Amino acid sequence: MGPSHSQLVGSQFGPRSAAYVASAVHAQGADLDHLVELVSGHATARVLDLGCGGGHVSFHVAPHVGHVTAYDLSHEMLAAVERVSAERGLANVSTQQGRVESLPFPEGAFDLVLSRYSAHHWHGFQSALIEVKRVLKPQGKAILMDVVSPGPALLDTYLQAVEMLRDPSHVRNYTLDEWRSALCEAGLAPGAHEVYRLRLEFNSWIARMNTARLHAQAIRSLQASMSEDVLRHFEIDADGSFTIDTMLLEATA
């Protein structure tokens, strides 16, 4: 019998906590800059960073809000967030461990729920969004950032394949339309969005997750077999580096 999805996520990310804290891809980006703009002016807000990983959302918004709860399945990730928060003097960041599908917070506990590069690991995507709605105050805002599927079936199949080969805890990168539909179903009103193109250097992308050599070779073999449509959209280079689509989507409770 294999591990549960939660156990798989924990085993994938726990040992990689230092790599994700240090990751330039996760530590910076136009989406983080825009996020800071959106939360500025909410000096007393209580914020939930859902699936916080290495804590970069928490670190960016903490100086601009009242309190941030960094929430993640991985104890090791949370320990890293606590350490870096202390190093940076971010006294208004606390941590909490748990699953996104069952948040240990009362209704209306937060003014803002933020999440970045986490939702594609959620086993219960819709359940998690329902929980986001529950813990937000009336008219509270969710700001959700993730890799998105470009939509067309061929491009989608390629993206999901390389993601799962790299990281077996991957579930799905959703399209923007799928996100909007799921938010509506959860009782959240989708709002403004931004889209971005994110360049990934192949060797560091693989190293960050400590991907098995056989799986890394399979990704390179798949890339070499792809049609021009895939090569062009993902801008796949000879060394395997490529570009993906990401988004920032706002929603209101």
Where are these regions (language model features)?
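A short glycine-rich, Lys/Arg-flanked "PGG" loop and its adjoining helix->strand segment in the class I
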Residues: 126-138
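A short acidic, Gly/Pro-enriched loop at the edge of an enzyme's catalytic core
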Residues: 101-112
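Conserved Class I S-adenosyl-L-methionine
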Residues: 54, 191-253
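Short alpha-helix
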Residues: 172-186
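A short SAM/SAH-binding and catalytic strip from SAM-dependent methyltransferases
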Residues: 112-124
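Class I SAM-dependent methyltransferase SAM/SAH-binding core
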Residues: 48-50, 54-102
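Conserved class I S-adenosyl-L-methionine
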Residues: 1-42, 56-60, 77-80, 143-165, 204-207
